[in-house]
């Protein structure tokens, strides 16, 4: 059934933060199979409204929750997709093409099939199975999983263990389980000089040489050596702007944006202090003014592998005959919110085609993921 579920889910044009009926489809399906469901819509305005779902079968512990998102990123040029449509499924050579196939409608389809089959085959299991789904993970993530977790806990629900269905595997299904994530902090630096004629530089103060020196130092600084589970923290310049299209004018100001992905040796605040010390030093030397802004959407985190995390890894190894590596690579995810409530793993399909034109998953990979999810429910419940 996971193939049918995936085909149906791909058909919903659920570009962030819209559900476009995807969450309603899952809600109806789970309700038909005895789940207690609730859809909540959060958001400050109509354009920001986010659709969320919590569905649970059973009332006993442990409550094993699948956490995921139905929203997808923009599909780009539709003409470049199979069937010229990212939201119309194309099945070729054992693969299913469509936006969201791996990120992450494929994982949702597999856990739907696994949980419904498990409930059908095990009428007296000891715990509960639940879903927490949102239509805003790829965007601001303000009114999605974070807000929904707080809501369900206020209602008296408790999650004992979560599986976040992000596409975590690198080369084959089962080679990686994420137990943490790097943090992310964005910076915007504005440097104010004094404009003037290029022939009279002594009557002006060009902010660009100062910016170049600063960015050169920042991009070459070694923030750390990494840790057992984390790679080195990394800074990337993402944008440089100079509002000057005239070749004989020294610009008055310039602006640069950069991002740091960081491990658990840092926080956004400590990095901001380190960055500002470098900026302050050079701006003083060049006698220019600066303004530095920063914002962090996620701090880094790492979990010590709990018994349930180890049990999940054993199920992966037993099912797929591959020993998974505990990993923290990749971008941010909603796991950063879930970890405040319960132990978790992130485990899903291959990440190779996520967000790309002609995103696809192999049907054989869907079967492997279904098997892992089903076997874990058998083992833990």
Curated annotation (Swiss-Prot):
Pathway connected to this protein: Amino-acid biosynthesis; L-lysine biosynthesis via DAP pathway; LL-2,6-diaminopimelate from (S)-tetrahydrodipicolinate (succinylase route): step 3/3
Gene Ontology MF terms in the entry: acetylornithine deacetylase activity; cobalt ion binding; succinyl-diaminopimelate desuccinylase activity; zinc ion binding
UniProt cofactor note: Binds 2 Zn(2+) or Co(2+) ions per subunit.
Protein keywords: Amino-acid biosynthesis, Cobalt, Diaminopimelate biosynthesis, Hydrolase, Lysine biosynthesis, Metal-binding, Zinc
InterPro entries on file: ArgE/DapE_CS, Bact_exopeptidase_dim_dom, DapE_proteobac, Peptidase_M20, Peptidase_M20_dimer, Peptidase_M20A
Listed cofactors: Zn(2+); Co(2+)
Active site (record annotation): 71, 137 (proton acceptor)
Binding annotation for Zn(2+) 2: 103, 138, 355
Pfam families: M20_dimer (PF07687), Peptidase_M20 (PF01546)
Swiss-Prot/TrEMBL catalytic activity: N-succinyl-(2S,6S)-2,6-diaminopimelate + H2O = (2S,6S)-2,6-diaminopimelate + succinate
Broad EC category: hydrolase
Domain of life according to the entry: Bacteria
EC number assigned by the record: 3.5.1.18
GO biological process, one term: L-arginine biosynthetic process
CDD domains listed in its UniProt record: M20_DapE_proteobac
Amino-acid positions noted as binding Zn(2+) 1 in the UniProt annotation, renumbered to this chain: 69, 103, 166
Coiled coil start-end: none
Homology family: Belongs to the peptidase M20A family. DapE subfamily.
Function recorded in the entry: Catalyzes the hydrolysis of N-succinyl-L,L-diaminopimelic acid (SDAP), forming succinate and LL-2,6-diaminopimelate (DAP), an intermediate involved in the bacterial biosynthesis of lysine and meso-diaminopimelic acid, an essential component of bacterial cell walls.
Oligomeric and partner information: Homodimer.
Name of the protein: Succinyl-diaminopimelate desuccinylase
Gene from which the chain derives: dapE
């Amino acid at each position: 059934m996971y193939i049918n579920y995936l085909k149906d889910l791909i058909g919903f044009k659920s570009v962030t933060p819209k559900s476009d009926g995807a969450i309603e489809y899952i809600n109806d399906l789970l309700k038909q199979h005895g789940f207690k469901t609730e859809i909540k819509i959060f958001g400050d305005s109509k354009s920001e409204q986010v659709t969320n779902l919590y569905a649970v079968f059973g009332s006993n512990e442990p409550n094993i929750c699948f956490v995921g998102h139905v929203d997808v990123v923009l599909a780009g040029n539709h003409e470049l997709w199979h069937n010229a449509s990212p939201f119309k499924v194309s099945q070729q050579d054992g693969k299913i093409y469509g936006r969201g196939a791996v990120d992450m409608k494929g994982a949702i389809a597999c856990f739907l099939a696994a949980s419904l089959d498990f409930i059908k085959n095990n009428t007296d299991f000891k715990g509960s199975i639940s879903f927490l789904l949102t239509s805003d993970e790829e965007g601001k993530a303000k009114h999605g999983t974070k807000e929904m977790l707080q809501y369900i806990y206020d209602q008296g629900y408790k999650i004992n263990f979560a599986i976040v269905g992000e596409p975590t595997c690198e080369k084959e299904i089962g080679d990686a389980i994420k137990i943490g994530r790097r943090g992310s902090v964005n910076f915007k630096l504005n440097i104010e000089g004094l404009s003037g004629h290029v022939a009279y530089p002594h009557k002006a103060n060009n902010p660009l040489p100062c910016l170049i020196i600063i960015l050169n130092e920042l991009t070459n600084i070694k923030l750390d050596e990494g840790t057992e589970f984390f790679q080195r923290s990394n800074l990337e310049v993402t944008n440089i702007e100079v509002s000057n299209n005239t070749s004989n004018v020294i610009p008055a100001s310039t602006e640069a944006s950069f991002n740091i992905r960081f491990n658990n040796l840092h926080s956004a605040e400590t990095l901001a202090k380190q960055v500002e010390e470098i900026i302050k030093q050079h701006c003083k030397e060049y006698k220019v003014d600066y303004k530095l802004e920063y914002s962090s959407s996620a701090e880094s985190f790492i979990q010590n592998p709990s018994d349930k995390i180890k049990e999940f890894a054993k199920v992966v190894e037993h099912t797929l005959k591959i020993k998974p590596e505990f990993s923290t690579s990749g971008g941010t995810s909603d796991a950063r919110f879930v970890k405040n409530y319960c132990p978790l793993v992130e485990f899903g399909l291959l990440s190779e085609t996520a967000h790309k034109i002609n995103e696809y998953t192999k049907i054989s990979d869907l079967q492997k993921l279904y098997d892992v999810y089903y076997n874990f429910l058998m083992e833990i419940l």
